[in-house]
Amino acid sequence: MTRYKAIISYDGTLFSGFQRQSQARTVQEEIEKTLQKLTGGQGIQIHGAGRTDAGVHAYGQVIHFDLEQKRDPEKLRFALDTQTPDDIDVISLEAAADDFHARYHKHFKTYEFLVDIGRPKNPMMRHYATHYPYPLDIAKMQAAIKDLVGTHDFTGFTAAGTSVKNKVRTITAATLTQDPKTGFLVFTFSGNGFLYKQVRNMVGTLLKIGNGRLPIEQIRLVLESKNRQLAGPTAAGNGLYLKEIIYEE
C-alpha cells in the first residue's frame, strides 16, 4: 500500500462543498470516482486538509489517499488531472510517508477573501467575489483586523451549534489590502486552524465596522465575550479561497 499526497485547486461554484454528501456534487466524490476508474474499480477514499463549504474555492487544498499498487507520481497526477471534471485541477502529486495525514498532520492554512466594492458590481466575478456596494472606511478595517492576530478563543466567530469543543486557535497574520487592478478588497488570514465559518464571520464583522455600523473595538468585544450575536453576519462563501497549506516537517 502506497500513500500519495496531492495539491489540488477547484472552482467551488458548482460544488456543495469538499466533503462527500448524499445526493449532492462534492469535490471528494468527483476525485474518488476518478480514482476508482483509474484503479479498475477499487474503492478509494481521499482525505482533505480542509472541508470547504458550498461555493468556496481552493488554490491549494491538500489531499491524501492510499493505493494498493505503486504508481509513477507524475503519470498518476496527469491521469487524475485530465480525467477529473474541468473545475478541478491536480497541481502536484507525490508519494508520502505512511503516517502522513492531510487533515491531522500539523499545518498552517492561509485563506483569502475577495470583496467586490464596485458600483455596479463586476458580473463576470459574481461567483468569485462577494459584492458589498455600501460605503467602507478601509483604514478603519485595517486597524480592526489587527485585533484578530494572536491566540484567542474564537467562539464568537464560529457558527452556532458547532460540535468542536476547543475553539482556541492562533492567527499568525491578518491583513487587508486593495487590489490596484480590480479595486477588490483582499482579506488574508493565516493560522494553525480555523473553525466552521470563522473566516466568513470575521469578514462579515469587519465589513460592518468599515460601514460604521459596528465600532472599531468590536473585534475585541466579540473575542472577550465569546458572543456570536455581537459579531457581524456571515459573508457569502463565493468570495472565500483556501489559498495555501504548509505542513511542519
From Swiss-Prot:
Binding-site positions, substrate: 111
Signal peptide: none
Keywords assigned by UniProt, alphabetized: Isomerase, tRNA processing
Gene3D superfamilies the UniProt entry points to: Pseudouridine synthase I, catalytic domain, C-terminal subdomain (3.30.70.660), Pseudouridine synthase I, catalytic domain, N-terminal subdomain (3.30.70.580)
Catalytic site: 53
Gene Ontology BP, a term: tRNA pseudouridine synthesis
InterPro entries linked: PsdUridine_synth_cat_dom_sf, PsdUridine_synth_TruA, PsdUridine_synth_TruA_a/b_dom, PsdUridine_synth_TruA_C, TruA/RsuA/RluB/E/F_N
Gene Ontology terms for molecular function: RNA binding; tRNA pseudouridine(38-40) synthase activity
Catalysis: reaction(s): uridine(38/39/40) in tRNA = pseudouridine(38/39/40) in tRNA
Annotated EC: 5.4.99.12
SUPFAM superfamilies, A to Z: Pseudouridine synthase
Subunit record text: Homodimer.
PANTHER family linked to this entry: PSEUDOURIDYLATE SYNTHASE (PTHR11142), TRNA PSEUDOURIDINE SYNTHASE-LIKE 1 (PTHR11142:SF0)
Purpose: Formation of pseudouridine at positions 38, 39 and 40 in the anticodon stem and loop of transfer RNAs.
UniProt family annotation: Belongs to the tRNA pseudouridine synthase TruA family.
UniProt-recorded name of the protein: tRNA pseudouridine synthase A
Source organism of this protein record: Streptococcus equi subsp. zooepidemicus (strain H70)
